[in-house]
Amino acid sequence: MKNIKVTLSSSQILALNTTPIELVPAITGKLLIPQFLFQKYNHISTAYTTGGLFRIGLGSITFGFSAFGAVITSADNAQGLNNFVYSQSTSGFTYQNLPLIIGATSTNPTGGDGTLDLYLTYLEVTL
């Protein structure tokens, strides 16, 4: 298992539906499988409003793992722990050589100004 920390800025959070963020770059010959995500929201003055959930995906949030609620709507510092459930089988889709990305599932969050620390634990499987 591997761990990585990624901090999302306010501008990245506000564009998370239109511009998903790469958490782990693609690795040739490897399949990346997320296991756990710890979210740490660093509130500044205004909470975000979201129109949907967040999702981690392989190359795209449309091919993703379980969607989850983001802690960025809290009026103070907040934390959340998410584990992932997945059962994907897609004909003609290649799982390896794809990055792990995070995005908002329906609309961009609005209104907030804090940052979000993401601590991702994932498997790196050689195929």
Residue ranges, per PLM feature:
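C-terminal interaction-tip segments
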Residues: M1-I13, T105-L127
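Terminal beta-strand-rich extracellular "head" domains
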Residues: T49-T90
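Sequence-level motif detector for i,i+2 pairs with an aromatic at +2
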Residues: M1-N3, G29, N97
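Short structured motifs
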Residues: T19-L23, V85-S87, A104
